[in-house]
C-alpha cells in the first residue's frame, strides 16, 4: 500500500497546470501519430517505386491497392477490441505503452517492405497498436483534466492529429521530387519520431484517478487528484472529488449490466445501452460524413475526379492540410462556447452543403463545354469541406464517448466507439477508389445524403456534455431522461445546470465539515495526552 506523506513529490514535483501539460503532450503526440498515419499512405500509393516494388501498377490492381490501404483500418478495429477487452485491467498508461510498442513493430515492417504480404502484415500490426492508443488516449486526457479544460484539451489533441496529417502531406510533397524508394520508405519510418516521445513521457505521468478508485487504489487516487489540482491531499475540494468518484463507482457496480443484458435490452436506470450507442453513433457519423475519402485519397480524387496533375494534386493536398489545421484550431476556442451538440450540428451542416455543391459542379463538369472550369471550382469546396469537418466532427466524436459513458463503461464505451470508427473507416476507404472509378460524380451523392440524414439525429437525440463533470452525466442518466433531449432544457443548455453546481457545493461543505471534525478530534486527543503527561510528571 502506498504511504502518503506531505513530503512525497511524485512526477518530478510537477503539479496543477504543468502536470496536465505533460499528460497533454503524451496524448497529443499519440493523436499526432494517428493523423500522420491517416495521411502517409495518400502519398505512398501514388509513388511509382512503391507500386512497382509491390506489383500494384495498372488499373486492374485498383481493388488490391484499396485493400492494402484499408487493411490498416481493420487492424485499428481489432486494436480497439483489444483495448475493450484488456484495457480496463491494464490501466490507461500501460495500454498506451502496449499500443506504442505494437506500432513500432508495424512501422519497421512497412518501412522495410519488399513484398505485398509484408506490407499487409505491417499495416495490420500498425493498426492494432493505433487502435489501442486511440481508444485509450482521449479517456486518459479526460480523466486527468479539470472540468474547465477537459473539452479544450481533447479537441486540442485532435488539432494535433491534423498537425500530424499536415506534416506528412508536406513530407509527401517534398519527397515527390526525390523519387525512388526513399520517397515512400522515409515517411513510413518517420513514425518513430512520435513513438520515441510516447516512450519517453508516458511511464512517469500519473494514472487516471478514476481508474485507480475503480480498482481499489483510493490512496494513490487521492495523491493524483491533489497533484492535478495543486492542492493538499486533505483539501475539501480534493476529498469531495474523490467522494463523488467513489459514489459513481459504487452506484454503477450495484446497477451494472453484463454485455448479455445489454444485448437483451434489460433496463437499468443509468441508461447504459443508450449512452454506449450515442458514443458509438458519433463515430459512425464522423466516418460516414465522408472525411476519409479525403484523408486517404485526396491526391487521387484530385487527379481522377478533377483532372489535376500528380504534382499539383500533392501540392493542393499539402496546402489544404494547412487550412485544415487552422479550422481544427478554431474548435479549441469554440468547444465550450458552442458546446458539443452545437459544433456537431454546425460541422455536419457545412459538410452537407459542401458535398451538395461538389456533386453539382462535378456533374456539370462532365456535360458542359466548360467542364474544366466546373471541376476546378469544385476544388474550393473540397477545401471548405475540410474546414467544416475540422471545427466539429473532427474532435467531438472522440471526446463525446469519454464523457457520455459511465465510469465502469468508459473504457468499454470508448473502445466500442473507436471500433465503430475503424470498421466504418475501412468501409469508406475500401469503396472509395471503386466508387469513383465506376459511378464517377454520382459517388458524391451518397455523402450528401448521409450528412443530411445525420442532422435530425444530432438535434433530437444527443444531450450536451459541455461544462458538466463526468459525475454530472451519471446523475443526469440516473434521473431517467427522455430519449428526445430537446424536451429538457437542462439536457441541451451549454452552461452547467444549477442543480449540479448546488450538489457540488453541498459535497464540498460536507467534506470541509468532516475535515474540521477530524481536526477537532485529533486536537482533543492530543490535549488529553498532554494533560495526562503533565499529571504524571506532577
Swiss-Prot record:
Record's GO cellular component terms: membrane
InterPro entries: MFS_dom, MFS_sugar_transport-like, MFS_Sugar_Transporters, MFS_trans_sf, Sugar/inositol_transpt, Sugar_transporter_CS
Keyword line: Glycoprotein, Membrane, Transmembrane, Transmembrane helix, Transport
PROSITE patterns reported in the protein's UniProt record: MFS (PS50850), SUGAR_TRANSPORT_1 (PS00216)
Record-annotated membrane-spanning stretches: 14-34, 67-87, 96-116, 120-140, 162-182, 186-206, 288-308, 315-335, 342-362, 379-399, 416-436, 443-463
Residue positions with a glycan: 268, 467
Chief location: membrane
Its membrane topology: Multi-pass membrane protein
Superkingdom in the source lineage: Eukaryota
GO MF entry, a single one: carbohydrate:proton symporter activity
Keyword Transcription set for record: no
Compartments (UniProt record): Membrane
Glycoprotein is among the record's keywords: yes
Pfam families assigned to the protein according to its UniProt record, in alphabetical order: Sugar_tr (PF00083)
Main function: MFS-type transporter; part of the gene cluster that mediates the biosynthesis of oryzines, natural products with an unusual maleidride backbone.
Entry-linked NCBIfam families: SP
Family: Belongs to the major facilitator superfamily. Sugar transporter (TC 2.A.1.1) family.
PANTHER family: MAJOR FACILITATOR SUPERFAMILY (MFS) PROFILE DOMAIN-CONTAINING PROTEIN-RELATED, PLASTIDIC GLUCOSE TRANSPORTER 4
Protein name: MFS-type transporter oryC
